[in-house]
Amino acid sequence: MRDPAPSNSEMKRVIVGMSGGVDSSVSAVLLMEQGYQVEGLFMKNWEEDDGTEYCTAREDLADAQAVCDKIGIKLHTANFAAEYWDNVFEHFLEEYKAGRTPNPDILCNREIKFKAFLDYALMLGADLIATGHYVRRRDIDGRTELLKGLDPNKDQSYFLHAVGGEQIARTLFPVGELEKPEVRAIAEKHGLATAKKKDSTGICFIGERRFTDFLRQYLPAQPGEIKTTEGEVIGRHSGLMYHTIGQRQGLGIGGLKDASDDPWYVLVKDLDNNELIVGQGNDHPWLFSRALVSSEIYWVNPIDLSSPRKLTAKVRYRQGDQPCTLEKTADGYRATFDDPQRAVTPGQSVVFYDGEICLGGGVIEIAEPWTSKDKR
């Protein structure tokens, strides 16, 4: 179902979040073709005062302006750097201090793109906002549902699970019905400057720089020992914050006597002892979990969990739907999976689905081992 076009008698004003990328550029074009009164808004969420050349905000703003000039719409600019620091980045640092691996893009969507931006757009007189996210929405029975994007390779519902239905109801997602090649073709057809611009990667405020170099600017390193599951010390790490469950690269382990040639993986981050526990093999049993616990779930719309419910879930972006049973417990929520789940990582998010409907999700706090013999 495509996002609704306005009736001829009611020209709705829509402000598109223009990132300087091809998806938001095409979103603006599509909305204009549907008859909306379209304007753009470029958000600056990070101050470029860290002495590096990595931040691309100036280039992105120039690209957004070029697109708006080409299609003949006004471009507003807004600085949400203070809100980003207070509501996203400080939480990001606290999570790393606690040894978890957070996903700031999820919090950015909830606090900045669908809160600060939405509020600002409404203040400017907009009826709706729009973004270039690959998701869809559906209005049914007095509520607005968040649906997966039709392109399974680009679906971004995982990152929008913490946005409430009321915010989704005020947002249009023009490219959610399209596949990426179609989006680029539309951009080429209209001669947009962003038509061949590559997709952004990594966390927005880090850009293309090395993550460990960035994190060291804000958090002191806390070196410790790297141990096997048997307790043998085989190396040293520069800080648990620089590692995540299932990580293979960058461990600096090699040439050990009596060890096989199988690669080493991070199995456990022992926060109490500041130790990194590693093991060999992509299918090491310690890498697999049967259940996870989250104390709080953000629902797009409230759901009934008076009894356990069969759903599907993702514990990382682009993962296939994993069948599970979700139940409410005294301390929060517990999801038990039908099949073993690899590298379930505290700090990351679990997102629940009912078919194509994204129901919501929360931060993973505990990953329960798959086998009872696993004494993590």
Swiss-Prot record:
GO terms under cellular component: cytoplasm
Predominant cellular place of this UniProt entry's protein: cytoplasm
| Entry binding sites for ATP | G17, M18, S19, G20, G21, V22, D23, S24, M43, G132
The annotated region (Interaction with target base in tRNA) lies at: 103-105
GO annotation, biological process: tRNA wobble position uridine thiolation
Q: List all disulphide bridges recorded for this chain.
A: C108-C204
Where does the record place the catalytic residues? C108 (nucleophile), C204 (cysteine persulfide intermediate)
Q: Where is this region: Interaction with tRNA?
A: 154-156, 316-317
* Catalytic activity field: S-sulfanyl-L-cysteinyl-[protein] + uridine(34) in tRNA + AH2 + ATP = 2-thiouridine(34) in tRNA + L-cysteinyl-[protein] + A + AMP + diphosphate + H(+)
Identify the residue position(s) of the site Interaction with tRNA: H133, Q348
Signal keyword on record: no
Arranged from A to Z, the UniProt key words for this protein are: ATP-binding, Cytoplasm, Disulfide bond, Nucleotide-binding, RNA-binding, Transferase, tRNA processing, tRNA-binding
Domain of life according to the entry: Bacteria
Uppermost EC category: transferase
Supply one GO molecular-function term: ATP binding
| Keyword Chloroplast included in the entry's annotation | no
Similarity comment: family membership: Belongs to the MnmA/TRMU family.
Q: What does this protein do?
A: Catalyzes the 2-thiolation of uridine at the wobble position (U34) of tRNA, leading to the formation of s(2)U34.
* HAMAP family in the cross-refs: tRNA_thiouridyl_MnmA
What is the protein's name according to its record? tRNA-specific 2-thiouridylase MnmA
Source organism lineage?
Answer: Bacteria, Pseudomonadati, Pseudomonadota, Gammaproteobacteria, Pseudomonadales
The UniProt gene name for this protein comes to: mnmA
